[in-house]
Amino acid sequence: VHETQFKLALAVLLLMVFYARLYYQRGRKGFEKVVIKHEKREKFLIELFALGLVPILFYLLTSWLDPFSFSLSTEIRWLGGVLIFMGNLLFIWSHRALGKNWSPLLEIRKGHTLVTKGPYRFIRHPMYTSIFLIGTGISILSANWIVSLSYMLPATIMYLIRISDEEEMMIERFGDEYTEYIRKTGRLVPKLSILRAQSNNRP
């Protein structure tokens, strides 16, 4: 399989991801913000993440990053494409569950509700899970160190910096309800104990 085929597959999959983001971004206008935290920092993190996408464009459009490739079998690389697709499905599912509650920044809106349906039934931050799934898929499908690091490093920095503040903000807004929600769910992956309990409770 020629490298061009992997690049074309990655381009198509990323266009699907960006289309999903633009679609839901369009629906967030017109809601009144009540609380917004660390606005400048949050905007910087988003810009850092966007900047990390630039090397991916160089990979797709040029051969400049070819010296940074690493060896993977064809089958494994196509598995990367599957991970990107699955990550995008989780991304869309998360957006649909959140509805008007979604924001790219740390903010509480008027009428903000605690969402515990869809993927939020099992994990508190499925969008981060989808971002890491997509990033893992990009790393495998491209088989390129620069592409992998340019996506995963900003994504990891964003997650580590903001996750505690995000949960603290939710506790301030929802109190014991969110504390109980934390007990029942994992941050990025479901708690096995909860999955077993739900499985045992099925008729």
Segments from the language model and where they lie:
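Membrane-anchoring alpha-helices and their flanking helix-loop junctions
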Residues: 1-116, 134-203
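Histidine-centered phosphotransfer motif of kinases
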Residues: 117, 121-129
